[in-house]
């Protein structure tokens, strides 16, 4: 298990681990992050800070990532202003930052190098044994599991994760070993910058298709290119249960280990059972004794994520005892099927869960896990669609999967910088689900009214889940932190959008 460490604001942080600095970055003194509050950006910033670099950054608002980095010694300002970058050696930008941002404009004027997040991650990985986890779904969970298994196996990895690893209290840490475990982002094809020693592909699904000009074949080609960034002695660990991954196997010219429930998987799960939030299964590997395991995560999709961790760990020589212990004691990740609270109302006792899944496949997996683990509970979902383009492109899939819950509340689309698209909004989605005839969805035009609307629908023994990748995480926290039925909940607007009422 990765333990939490004390975070303090110390002037010694800037000289904390200079021996671990990237050798060829010796001329770099101050690294400035534009959009430092994002999980991926903040994670890389934390590792670089602990390597001894001066870190500064800017974002549009305070969050836990910003507060943590400040406590570690980073200089962070709220708001994007040209003067923020004047003393920087290099600028790191997230994909959410557009070219007209005043800090980018000033950096180009001063000829300060501007790199994307993945390029900086690639530099961290260059002189380490990199393990990069790619795929449409499950990257954060799989990365967290691998980091936890390696830590339990005394390998002390550096890790950069797109979510909060609960046992560590952070999403990034500088380890003492040669291992670096990190997510590889396909959303903008920036994972092609990475040159790891081991690459994992959890699955391939249609998402972020604007990056690939709407061409699924181009998306598949890009995954093959990612795998072929491995050296000839590298290893591809891939989920053979995913039909697209299976289709691509003949095109992979690197050593491959497959995993899954399929009979022909190299690392195979059998005898799957789910008991509440715990999944039990047996791992079979040819030539080895079967290994009974439990992972503190619900659902078959999470067993697949665990299998990826088992496959990578076994290849790196982690013993079975450490693997089993890490999975059994795994404390989860923030916003990945995270139980927030048990609560009581006039209607009875209930539980509140929060989940990041925002693609129809992810929502479907969550619903299945809940049905299997808690078959006696009614499922009440509060869903916030993420991006108008995704809602448009996967509209019928959303209608189908969201119709499978018992009670549905739909918040307005989280735009993430996009312009609204006609008939790809939550009101249209609610109308289509209603016409399907399975459930009667509730469109929530004013998020402040959500507690009162929930109160009219809740029943004893319900399981309430807040689902989505946008500002709904703040809604979930407010519901958990206050009385669900008597306290108004609000959402802090992000840089791109606000949740607006229909008045």
Curated annotation (Swiss-Prot):
Pathway(s) of this molecule: Cell wall biogenesis; peptidoglycan biosynthesis
Main subcellular localisation: cytoplasm
Cytoplasm listed as a keyword: yes
A biological process from GO: regulation of cell shape
GO MF term set: ATP binding; UDP-N-acetylmuramate-L-alanine ligase activity
Gene3D superfamilies linked to this entry: Mur ligase, C-terminal domain, Mur-like, catalytic domain, NAD(P)-binding Rossmann-like Domain
EC number: 6.3.2.8
Start-end of Low complexity biased regions: 8-18
The organism's place on the tree of life at top rank: Bacteria
Keyword list, A-Z: ATP-binding, Cell cycle, Cell division, Cell shape, Cell wall biogenesis/degradation, Cytoplasm, Ligase, Nucleotide-binding, Peptidoglycan synthesis
Biological role stated in the UniProt entry: Cell wall formation.
Family, per entry: Belongs to the MurCDEF family.
Protein name, per record: UDP-N-acetylmuramate--L-alanine ligase
Organism: Colwellia psychrerythraea (strain 34H / ATCC BAA-681)
């Amino acid at each position: 298990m990765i333990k939490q460490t004390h975070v303090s604001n110390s002037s010694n942080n800037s000289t904390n681990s200079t021996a671990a600095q990237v050798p060829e970055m010796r001329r770099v003194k101050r690294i400035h992050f534009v959009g430092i509050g994002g999980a991926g950006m903040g994670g890389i910033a934390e590792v670089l800070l602990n390597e001894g670099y001066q870190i500064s950054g800017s974002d549009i608002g305070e969050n836990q990532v910003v507060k943590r980095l400040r406590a570690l010694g980073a200089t962070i300002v709220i708001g994007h202003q040209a003067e923020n970058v004047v003393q920087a050696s290099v600028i790191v930008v997230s994909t959410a930052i557009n070219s007209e941002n005043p800090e980018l404009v000033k950096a180009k004027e001063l000829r300060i190098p501007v790199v994307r997040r993945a390029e900086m991650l690639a530099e961290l990985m260059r002189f380490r044994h990199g393990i990069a986890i790619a795929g449409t779904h499950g990257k954060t969970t799989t990365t967290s599991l691998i980091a936890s298994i390696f830590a339990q196996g005394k390998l002390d990895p550096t890790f950069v994760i797109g979510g909060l690893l609960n046992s560590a209290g952070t999403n990034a840490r500088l380890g003492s070993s040669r291992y670096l475990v990190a997510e590889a982002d396909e959303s903008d094809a920036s994972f092609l910058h990475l040159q790891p020693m081991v690459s994992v592909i959890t699955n391939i699904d249609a998402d972020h298709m604007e990056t690939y000009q709407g061409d699924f074949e181009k998306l598949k080609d890009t995954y093959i290119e990612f795998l072929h960034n491995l050296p000839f002695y590298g290893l591809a660990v891939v989920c053979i249960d995913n039909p697209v991954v299976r289709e691509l196997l003949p095109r992979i010219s690197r050593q491959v280990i497959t995993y899954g429930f399929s009979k022909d998987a190299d690392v195979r799960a059998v005898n799957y059972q789910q008991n509440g939030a715990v999944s039990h299964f047996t791992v079979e590997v040819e030539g080895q004794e079967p290994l009974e395991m439990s992972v503190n995560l619900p659902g078959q999709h999470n067993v697949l994520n665990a299998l990826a961790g088992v496959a990578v760990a076994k290849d790196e020589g982690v013993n079975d005892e450490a693997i089993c212990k890490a999975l059994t004691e795994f404390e989860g990740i923030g916003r990945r099927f995270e139980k927030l609270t048990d609560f009581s109302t006039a209607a009875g006792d209930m539980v509140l869960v929060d989940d990041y899944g925002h693609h129809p496949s992810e929502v479907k997996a969550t619903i299945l896990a809940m049905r299997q683990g808690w078959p006696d509970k009614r499922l009440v979902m509060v869903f916030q669609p993420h991006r108008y383009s995704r809602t448009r492109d996967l509209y019928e899939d959303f209608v189908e999967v969201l119709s499978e819950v018992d009670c549905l509340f739909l918040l307005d689309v989280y735009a993430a910088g996009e312009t609204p698209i006609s008939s790809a909004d939550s009101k249209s989605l609610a109308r289509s689900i209603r016409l399907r005839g399975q459930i009667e969805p509730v469109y929530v035009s004013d998020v402040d009214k959500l507690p009162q609307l929930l109160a009219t629908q809740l029943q004893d023994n319900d399981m309430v889940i807040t689902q989505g990748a946008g500002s709904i995480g703040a809604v979930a926290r407010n519901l958990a932190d206050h009385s669900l039925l008597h306290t108004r909940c609000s959402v802090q607007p992000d840089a791109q959008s606000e949740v607006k009422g229909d008045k």
